[in-house]
Amino acid sequence: MSSSPTNASSPPVATSVPGAAVGLTLLAVAVAVGLPGNALVLWSCAVTHRRTIPVLLISHLALADVVTLLTGPFYLRALSVGQWDMGLAICHGCHYLCAAAMYVSVFLIALLGLHRCLAVSRPAMAVVTAGGHAGQLAHGAAAATWLVALVLAVPSIVFRRVENGHCRRVHSTEAWLVFHNLLETILGWALPLTAVAIGYGLLIRRLRQTRLAQRGRTFRLVVAVVVAFAVTWGPYHLASLLEVVVVAQGGGGTLEVVARATRPPATALAFLSSAMNPLLYACAGRGLRRGTGRSLLPRLLEISAIAGSTR
């Protein structure tokens, strides 16, 4: 099993693949909803006067989603014509950007969760990080996140080829396939989300001791972002783990068929995750529409910072 149909950074690329029509629909919806939605989030964060750490981290998260969705038209073309006819350079570029954005997204979500935990468990630290150094801290953390993600995404170029009209992963050995799949699953999904889950388990105990409704609203927002990422990327990483199990069993059999059939729709679902966050922010901000005319998302997160510091 030296090659696999696709990876974290590409939806299914041939209309003959089962589920390709579903993938085409999901991708079109993601681009149509996600690009303007994330652009609005970026504008909302840019015009706010109080640029707290959560606001700045969410702006970088929206930027990662925009990077992913800007590659959507290339994949839509490939899906519509049934082949990849745009050359190896665009194949590499699209997959590299999307793989990097995947890592950036999950790392920033983990940082958001960590900041939320600190805001509740260490209110004094929340006050400090909400001060004049907030921008430097957030942009520094985001820059480090992007740098690490760009390095981790290199395998998406190394193991990517255009063969028989398809831009797909090709591994020279099964060991490289196992390495690639486990790298994505552990560092791009399981480890960061496990850390957030543990931190939030402790945070829930703290929240039960407070009556601050606004803090609960922000808590639910961040939880929704975490859960949305975990759910939309879960099937993709499950397919990756199935491929690893197939290699361990010597290849072939029903499990390999299931892994190959699961990968295309699972990858399309993962791509859709880039369009979900703006919808979650909109739902979380519904209760803040009355009052000042400032942006809802920054205002929601500012309330969170104030609540964390007044415990």
Can you say where each PLM-predicted feature lies in the sequence?
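Loop architecture of class A 7-transmembrane GPCRs
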Residues: 2-14, 79, 83-103, 121-122, ...
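First transmembrane helix
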Residues: 18-48, 67, 194-200
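Alpha-helical transmembrane segments of integral membrane proteins
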Residues: 19-23, 56, 137-141, 180, ...
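Extracellular TM2-ECL1-early TM3 structural module of rhodopsin-like
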Residues: 19-24, 28, 51-112, 118-130
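Residue-level signal for short hydrophobic patches within transmembrane helices
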Residues: 21-33, 56-59, 63, 97, ...
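Alpha-helical transmembrane segments of multi-pass membrane proteins
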Residues: 31, 60-72, 141-153, 185-193, ...
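Hydrophobic/aromatic residues in alpha-helical transmembrane segments
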Residues: 38-41, 72, 106-113, 153, ...
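Seventh transmembrane helix
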Residues: 231-240, 261-311
